[in-house]
Regions:
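Conserved catalytic-core segments centered on acid/base and nucleophilic motifs
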Residues: 10-11, 23, 56-58, 63-64
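Conserved AdoMet/S-adenosylmethionine-binding subsite of the radical SAM
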Residues: 41, 45-55, 64-203
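Short, well-ordered loop/turn elements at secondary-structure boundaries
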Residues: 4-6, 17, 52, 174
Length: 204
């Protein structure tokens, strides 16, 4: 997906480590976006031909559920394109299933020429534990920039105390709280909705 100048988004997989009830991509046609070797070659060719692309974003699904072999094939191709300066990966794996990140995965993420930015998705401080701390330490020591995005969810984190605790816990684990999103309107998730007015008051 090449929607904005300077960056391109790759839907790396339709699989996730956890299924979020409020996911805005639940009806995305993942079957049409299978990441086989032929598709990877086509994507890399497109990025190579567009020298204005400086950032590649891997999303999904969750790109870190890919095998180290498949992820390595994609990352090696991206890293060989000299005008790509940043690789941004959006994932919930570090907090919901950190065991999926093997030594091979970590080696891939920490050996890139391009700057790697890992945008985690943590909505509540209770999602952070000793396992996530150990993993974040390894990634940070390997030069990976760690950011976080949260979705404002009614009854989960729509109060100042929880949001403050979340920010503090993220900072303690070396992750910068970066995005706080309003919920996208998806079927079956209206009970999580927080009004924009309340969201603005929480941020004031």
């Amino acid at each position: 997906l090449h929607k904005y100048p300077g960056r391109v988004l790759i839907v790396a997989t339709g699989s996730c480590a956890v299924h979020c009830r409020y996911c805005f991509r639940r009806h995305f046609p993942y079957e049409e976006s299978r990441l086989d070797s032929e598709t990877i070659d086509r994507i890399l060719s497109y990025v190579q031909q567009h020298s204005d692309i400086h950032e590649v974003i891997l999303s999904g699904g969750d790109p870190l559920v890919l095998s180290a072999r498949r992820l390595g094939e994609l990352l090696a191709g991206i890293d060989a394109i000299v005008h790509v300066k940043r690789l941004r990966i959006h994932s919930r794996v570090p907090t919901v299933m950190p065991e999926l990140l093997t030594t091979e995965h970590l080696a891939l993420l920490t050996s890139m020429r391009a700057k790697v930015v890992l945008v985690n998705h943590v909505n509540h401080p209770d999602e952070l534990d000793n396992d996530s701390q150990r993993l974040f330490n390894l990634l940070r020591l390997g030069g990976v920039t760690l950011l976080n995005q949260s979705v404002l969810l009614r009854g989960v984190n729509d109060d100042v105390e929880t949001l403050c605790r979340l920010s503090e816990r993220l900072f303690e684990q070396g992750v910068l709280p970066y995005y706080l999103h309003q919920l996208d309107k998806v079927a079956g998730a209206a009970h999580f909705n927080v009004s924009e007015e309340r969201g603005c008051k929480l941020m004031a």
